[in-house]
């Protein structure tokens, strides 16, 4: 039997089954068995850990069997619905026949099963139980700290000791909790003795007595070298000679008392070997604050340089709740780096090592997402359990002894612990370092290549911002010389020897092939993908160039590109590739040659965090982990993108610092649009029989043709003009170190939700302040960075002040009640927008729009299917249930959900929930097929494809584990596709991994293709007011990609819609209308493009990107009207003054823009007349000559 400790052969059996969350009590159970069997012959004691059941079905089967034949059942720490439901029928049946059922420290559904003598918790409360309820209510009023709860737990049995009757069974229940929470071998033994002697049907055993629970310190210190392992005096702890720093470690009291401490011992040993003095503290009740107060502060202030939590939980809370506000206040008081390391409870170390995704859905949420809300960084796996097969995740090849495997003892992951120790040491030393000696590596980006994109980032004026940051660093005491102007800074980084070596930036260093070969531990992995060192990227054949410029102790470098741009074969591969030699060498050079103490990734976003590897819970074989190593990594990130920021935190150890997005403004009207509106205003004011009305109609017709609005009636024309005029656009790019002007503040405040005058003044004050540089300086100095939720400024002013550490929403609470309501309304708008009820909708889901809307698009998908989320007793997401057809009032729509890789990583619980909703709908046997399109299609797929209903009901698709994007955008961006169906090939190759109820992917391109044949509508929500479908390439990569795949599957276009919820309400537009609106409100609007061009080269790059993205929509959907290309050509290329201006600012982007417009013509996306085409070609040739330095100036 799993985890069972048996009695002597031939003795009558008596069985006790303990069903709990984890296996920390397995060791004590094994050790106490011989002593128990001396007094209780035939007794068997088994420990069953619910955390093991998902990955080990045999463990669940053993638990059910043990419950079925147990004489006493103890169930505790069961808080997760999946665990509860797995054994609830067996527990309910056992309750009616066992000698005693003890449910404690668990979900109410488990606690209510308690039946101990006269104590039956399913009966109405009376007597002592009524008193208990009053006491529990009083404890909530007095606070919910672990210390106060434990005090009450010790007090109540003393109060009940002399109360006769049922009170003695209630006392037994409290004593059972005391024994369990005091979880040593002795206390577990005495708990068993106590329960058996009191409740066993064997009367002879009633004479045996149990000792009272041994009380251990609730708060204390642990060290394996101490005589008793536990002390309350820090002076008892050993301290390494010449210790460089002191680090506070937070540990779980339960593991220490159970003597399951091999993982803690390994951490302590590794830290001390590196010269780190440790304060290994523990506290009871899953609240770390008492330990912090007792040992990490003294009269002089903070006594530690960094804090590492080894608990796997949030600082204040556990598996049931999380008090982030209390945690943040405690951590602000310490003001040291806070690192969250976690032991694995839901899988073995070997399973984790082999898992492409790394952590499972519950692990990702509990171990990573919730600590992030406290401000934790650098999430690191450090321990877990072994089965007999051991772990092959690193060359160490760790295995457990048979005894350790049987006891399911925690084992350290030595490779990860070494990394944890080095990361912690570097962060602690960073905090202690002298500013004048601190060396900082600033990382800029240059993607896509050959596009004038070097030194650009989303929403950010990079060089203006960097100039301000460098000057602030100099004032702070950093040793560096800053160029005299922004342009001088730009020239120093991007100029210098760049042209001499044919590179996009100055050559700062050259790393020889010999050095690459001798110094790259994973050389074979890189050479397998890219050939022998030094490769062809950023190389002269003898070595690799390091691009950038050094300014004293600050190096500003350019991150190399992915390397696969323009290579269709690589882009069609379903997974990622190892980084190039140049990419690997860049980070190694920063770490070893430049000697950086900290990196600063400047803006959103680079390629590091998108390199292949696990989604969460990095191992030493994951490329982000290999590349960044133990270097502290500060990341300047847009406040409106918590999803990609979270990816950077989890995969590259980023400590994020938020910056605002550009200020917003109304688009207004310009040139012909304003003239047309003036004419329409006069027209609408005239009486129907006014004589001038006919003449004005002719003028309106001419004006409408001039702005390509002549295909609609006058009323529609008027509405489109108002829509364009009222559209929100960004005013240029954001500059770090430059607060909004008073006019910009007023404009943005006017767009925000209604607020009190006090709140309005507070928001205005925060917008006037410069907090981002201050935040960067704090992060570069190794301070605690206060967490802040991400979002859009006008919808969530809570993102202020910026300069803090961004995090996502609590995944357990998503979707919220408001999001459920809003998602249902948006689903109905989509159905109303389509001429007839669609049978199948292809819905694109991103992480960012869901996190910022608390799950609105997720709720929309559920609403279309006729489902709703299910939450457990604690308000945590537990799954999905179907809405009855009678309540739904329409058929269930089949929804093909394609998730971004980031959604898959950040929202694994929601991924499983969506899959469960589709599965339940597909298996709703009593529903007419005409009212359930999901079931109708699934039955058809099952029959045609010869698969079971589990497979036929799969509707959630995404990338392979550790892979991101469809690469449709890269194919378009590099003009690396021939026929448009090659884009469908890429999409299906990358996005054909089906995610079912288990959350694990299975590649099934055949099912995706079959599903796409029935799609009537493709749809995606517009994520943010700062974005449009033409401003970033991700929209046509996802929505465009699936639309192209649908066209190929069904042989005709599906309708494509955009849901614009950027202003709080909801508007559904056709994609064609959305592109036209954005072209008028943004691309062709002087207010918009002049705002970009004031930032020079970076603004030109943004304009070029919009032209390329427009081409992407034509390639994928054919939904771009020809006039769009005509007007873009006239505005930016055929106008000589504008052309020369753009070429002077950014020659590469200008050439690329002209080439894009010619490519659109060549691909027949528009047909310019011969004169226009010749002029466009001539202009392109002129720009090309200028770029090559041939044209006369």
From Swiss-Prot:
Claim: ATP-binding is one of the keywords in the record: yes
Catalytic reaction equation(s): protoporphyrin IX + Mg(2+) + ATP + H2O = Mg-protoporphyrin IX + ADP + phosphate + 3 H(+)
Coiled coil: none
Pathway(s) annotated for this protein in UniProt: Porphyrin-containing compound metabolism; bacteriochlorophyll biosynthesis (light-independent)
The enzyme's E.C. designation: 6.6.1.1
Gene Ontology molecular-function annotations: ATP binding; magnesium chelatase activity
Keyword Ligase assigned: yes
Keywords: ATP-binding, Bacteriochlorophyll biosynthesis, Chlorophyll biosynthesis, Ligase, Nucleotide-binding, Photosynthesis
A GO BP entry: photosynthesis
Biological function: Involved in bacteriochlorophyll pigment biosynthesis; introduces a magnesium ion into protoporphyrin IX to yield Mg-protoroporphyrin IX.
Protein family membership: Belongs to the Mg-chelatase subunit H family.
Protein name, UniProt field: Magnesium-chelatase subunit H
């Amino acid at each position: 039997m799993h985890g069972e400790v048996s009695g002597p052969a031939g003795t009558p059996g008596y069985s006790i089954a303990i069903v709990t969350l984890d296996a920390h009590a397995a060791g004590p159970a094994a050790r106490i068995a011989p002593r128990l069997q001396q007094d209780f012959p035939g007794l068997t004691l088994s420990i069953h850990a619910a955390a093991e059941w998902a990955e080990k079905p045999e463990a669940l089967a053993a638990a059910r069997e043990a419950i079925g034949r147990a004489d006493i059942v103890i169930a505790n720490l069961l808080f997760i619905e999946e665990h509860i439901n797995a054994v609830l029928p067996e527990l309910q049946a056992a309750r009616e026949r066992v000698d005693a059922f003890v449910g404690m420290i668990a979900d109410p559904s488990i606690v209510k099963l308690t039946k101990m003598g006269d104590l039956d918790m399913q009966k109405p409360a009376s007597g002592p139980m009524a008193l208990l309820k009053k006491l529990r209510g009083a404890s909530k009023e007095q606070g919910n700290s672990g210390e106060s709860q434990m005090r009450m737990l010790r007090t109540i049995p003393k109060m009940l000791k002399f109360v006769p009757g049922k009170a003695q069974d209630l006392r037994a229940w409290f004593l059972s909790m005391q024994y369990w929470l005091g979880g040593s071998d002795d206390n577990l033994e005495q708990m068993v003795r106590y329960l058996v002697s009191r409740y066993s049907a064997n009367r002879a055993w009633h004479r045996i007595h149990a000792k009272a629970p041994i009380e251990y310190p609730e708060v204390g210190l642990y060290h394996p070298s101490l005589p008793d392992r536990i002390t309350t005096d820090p002076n008892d702890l050993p301290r390494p000679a010449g210790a460089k720093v002191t680090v506070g470690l937070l540990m779980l009291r339960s593991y220490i008392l159970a003597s399951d401490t091999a993982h803690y011992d390994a951490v302590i040993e590794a830290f001390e070997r590196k010269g780190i003095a440790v304060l290994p503290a523990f506290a009871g009740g899953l609240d770390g604050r008492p330990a912090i107060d007792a040992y990490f502060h003294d009269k002089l202030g903070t006594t530690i340089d960094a804090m590492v939590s080894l608990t796997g939980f949030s600082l204040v809370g556990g598996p049931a709740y999380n008090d982030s506000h209390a945690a943040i206040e405690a951590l602000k008081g310490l003001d040291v780096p806070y690192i969250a390391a976690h032991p694995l409870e839901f899988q073995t170390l070997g399973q984790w090592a082999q898992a492409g995704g790394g952590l499972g859905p519950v692990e990702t949420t509990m171990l990573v997402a919730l600590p992030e809300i406290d401000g934790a960084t650098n999430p690191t796996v450090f321990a877990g359990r072994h089965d007999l097969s051991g772990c092959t995740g690193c060359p160490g090849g760790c295995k457990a002894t048979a005894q350790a495997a049987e006891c399911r003892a925690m084992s350290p992951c030595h490779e990860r612990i070494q990394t944890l120790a080095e990361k912690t040491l570097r962060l602690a030393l960073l905090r202690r370092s002298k500013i004048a000696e601190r060396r900082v590596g600033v990382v800029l980006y240059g993607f896509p290549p050959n596009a004038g994109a070097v030194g650009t980032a989303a929403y950010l004026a990079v060089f203006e911002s960097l100039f301000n940051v460098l000057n602030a660093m100099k004032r702070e005491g950093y040793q560096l010389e800053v160029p005299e102007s922004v342009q001088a800074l730009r020239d120093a980084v991007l100029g210098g020897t760049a042209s001499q070596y044919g590179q996009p930036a100055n050559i700062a260093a050259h790393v020889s092939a010999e050095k690459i070969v001798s110094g790259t531990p994973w050389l074979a992995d890189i050479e397998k993908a890219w050939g022998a060192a030094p490769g062809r990227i950023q190389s002269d054949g003898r070595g690799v160039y390091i691009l950038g410029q050094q300014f004293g102790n600050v190096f500003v470098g350019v991150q190399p590109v992915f390397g696969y741009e323009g290579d269709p074969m690589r882009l069609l591969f379903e997974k990622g590739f190892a980084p190039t030699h140049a990419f690997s060498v860049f980070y190694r050079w920063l770490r070893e040659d430049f000697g950086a103490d900290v990196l600063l990734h400047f803006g959103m976003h680079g390629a590091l965090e998108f390199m292949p590897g696990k989604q969460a819970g990095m191992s030493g074989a994951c490329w982000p982990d290999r590349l960044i190593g133990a270097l502290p990594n500060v990341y300047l990130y847009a406040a409106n993108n918590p999803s990609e920021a979270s990816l950077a935190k989890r995969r590259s150890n980023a400590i994020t610092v938020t910056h605002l997005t550009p200020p917003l403004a109304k688009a207004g009207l310009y040139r012909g649009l304003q003239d047309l509106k003036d004419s329409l205003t006069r027209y609408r004011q005239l009486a129907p029989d006014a004589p001038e009305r006919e003449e004005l109609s002719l003028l309106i017709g001419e004006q409408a043709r001039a702005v390509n609005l002549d295909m609609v009636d006058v009323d529609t024309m008027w509405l489109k003009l108002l829509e364009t005029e009222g559209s929100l656009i960004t005013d240029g790019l954001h500059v770090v170190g430059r607060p909004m002007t008073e006019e910009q503040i007023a404009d943005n405040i006017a767009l925000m939700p209604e607020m009190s005058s006090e709140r309005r003044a507070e928001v205005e004050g925060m917008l006037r302040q410069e907090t981002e540089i201050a935040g960067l300086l704090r992060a570069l100095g190794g301070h605690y960075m206060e967490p802040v939720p991400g979002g859009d400024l006008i919808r969530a002013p809570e993102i202020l002040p910026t300069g803090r550490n961004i995090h996502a929403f609590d995944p357990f609470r998503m979707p919220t009640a408001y999001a459920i309501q809003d998602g249902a309304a948006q689903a109905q708008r989509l159905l109303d927008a389509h001429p007839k009820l669609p049978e199948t909708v292809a819905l694109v889901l991103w992480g960012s729009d869901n996190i910022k809307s608390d799950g609105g698009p997720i709720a929309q998908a559920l609403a279309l299917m006729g489902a709703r989320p299910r939450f457990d007793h604690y308000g945590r997401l537990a799954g999905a249930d179907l809405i009855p057809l009678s309540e739904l009032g329409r058929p269930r729509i089949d929804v093909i959900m394609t998730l971004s890789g980031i959604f898959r990583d950040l929202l694994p619980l929601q991924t499983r929930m969506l899959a469960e909703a589709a599965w339940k709908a597909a298996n709703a046997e009593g529903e007419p097929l005409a009212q359930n399109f999901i079931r109708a299609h699934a039955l058809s797929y099952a029959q045609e494809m010869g698969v079971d209903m589990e497979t036929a009901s799969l509707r959630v698709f995404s990338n392979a584990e550790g892979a991101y994007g469809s690469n449709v955008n890269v194919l378009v961006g590099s003009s690396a596709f021939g026929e448009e169906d090659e884009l469908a090939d890429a999409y299906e190759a990358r996005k054909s991994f089906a995610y079912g109820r288990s959350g694990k992917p299975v590649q099934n391109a055949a099912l995706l293709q079959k599903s796409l044949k029935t799609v009537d509508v493709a749809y995606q929500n517009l994520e943010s007011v700062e974005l449009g479908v033409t401003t970033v390439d991700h929209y046509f990569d996802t929505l465009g990609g699936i639309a192209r795949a649908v066209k190929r599957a069904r042989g005709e276009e599906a309708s494509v819609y955009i849901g614009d919820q950027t202003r709080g309400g909801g508007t559904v537009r056709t994609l064609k209308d959305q592109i036209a609106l954005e072209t008028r409100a943004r691309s062709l609007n002087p207010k918009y493009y002049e705002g970009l061009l004031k930032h020079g080269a970076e603004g030109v790059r943004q304009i070029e990107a919009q032209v390329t993205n427009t081409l992407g929509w034509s390639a994928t959907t054919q939904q771009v009207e020809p006039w769009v290309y005509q007007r873009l050509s006239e505005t930016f290329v055929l106008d000589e003054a504008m052309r020369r201006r753009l070429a002077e600012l950014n020659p590469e982007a200008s050439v690329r823009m002209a080439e894009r417009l010619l490519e659109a013509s060549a691909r027949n996306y528009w047909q310019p007349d011969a004169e226009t085409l010749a002029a466009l070609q001539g202009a392109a040739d002129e720009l090309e000559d200028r770029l090559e330095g041939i044209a006369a100036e």
